Design a protein with these regions (language model features):
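A generic local structural motif
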Residues: 1-4, 56-58
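Local sequence-structure signature of Cys/Sec-based thiol-disulfide redox active-site neighborhoods
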Residues: 2-40
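Loop/helix-junction capping segments adjacent to catalytic residues or to phosphate/diphosphate-binding pockets
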Residues: 22-25, 49, 80-81
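Generic recognition of short, well-ordered alpha-helical segments
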Residues: 26-30, 53-54, 82
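Short glycine/proline-enriched coil/turn segments at helix->beta-strand junctions
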Residues: 36-38, 64, 75-76, 93
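Thioredoxin-like thiol-disulfide oxidoreductase module
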Residues: 44-65, 93
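Short, structured active-site "lid" loops
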Residues: 57-79
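Non-catalytic, surface beta->alpha helical segment in thiol-disulfide oxidoreductase systems
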Residues: 73-93
């Protein structure tokens, strides 16, 4: 599985599970880029085979509805959807 890393300032451990064709996912990535924070992301729809099952199980742990984007912050907080204010608040920005 190909987890991509985006360098930036440390605002905690940020993992973004997204779909490559999702507009809300693109908006969330753009927000993180504009905020200049470091984060990792994975396009779940591009993962194949058994790895895809593992990723889906991981996302469902945080978001049983399996909707995107799903952002996990510091392995403790989950934000689902493009929620600009919630993201800024969670990252203390």
């Amino acid at each position: 599985m190909k987890i991509e890393h985006v360098p930036g300032k440390n605002a905690g451990k940020i993992m973004l599970y997204a779909l490559s064709t999702c507009g809300h996912c693109r908006n969330t990535k753009n927000l993180l880029n504009n905020l200049g924070v470091e984060y990792d992301y994975l396009f779940v729809d591009l993962v194949q085979g058994q790895e895809k099952e593992q990723v889906i199980a991981l996302v469902e742990k945080w978001n049983p509805d399996l909707s995107f984007p799903t952002m996990v912050i510091n392995d403790s907080k989950c934000i689902v959807g493009f929620r600009e204010d919630d993201i800024k608040r969670a990252l203390k920005l």
